[in-house]
Amino acid sequence: MWLKIQVFVLALALITLGIQAEPNSGPNNPLIQEEARACADVYKECWYPEKPCCKDRACQCTLGMTCKCKATLGDLFGRR
């Protein structure tokens, strides 16, 4: 009887883990797509040369080495 309860609890735990792991496991996951981009958008983290800023924007770094893509005047006024 005790063995049946242990097997049931183990099976229930494995099923629960499997259900929790499924939503983010697909190739169309937004987090995976964001990391796979070749360049960084405005105000996103950048690091040259691995992930430069898109559209020749400047990658501006602080003293703490946190680098973000700087907006251009066209970005500020809605031009693309």
Swiss-Prot record:
InterPro entries: Spidertoxin (IPR004169). The keyword Amino-acid biosynthesis does not apply. Disulfide bonds join 39-54, 46-59, 53-69, 61-67. GO terms for cellular component: extracellular region. Residues 22-37, 72-80 form a propeptide. Gene3D superfamilies: 4.10.40.10. It is found in: Secreted. It comes from the Eukaryota. Pfam families: Toxin_9. GO terms for molecular function: calcium channel regulator activity; ion channel inhibitor activity; toxin activity. Keywords: Calcium channel impairing toxin, Disulfide bond, Ion channel impairing toxin, Knottin, Neurotoxin, Secreted, Signal, Toxin, Voltage-gated calcium channel impairing toxin. Expressed by the venom gland. Residues 1-21 form the signal peptide. Antagonist of L-type calcium channels (Cav1/CACNA1). Belongs to the neurotoxin 02 (plectoxin) family. 01 (Tx3) subfamily. The presence of a 'disulfide through disulfide knot' structurally defines this protein as a knottin. This is U6-ctenitoxin-Pn1a.
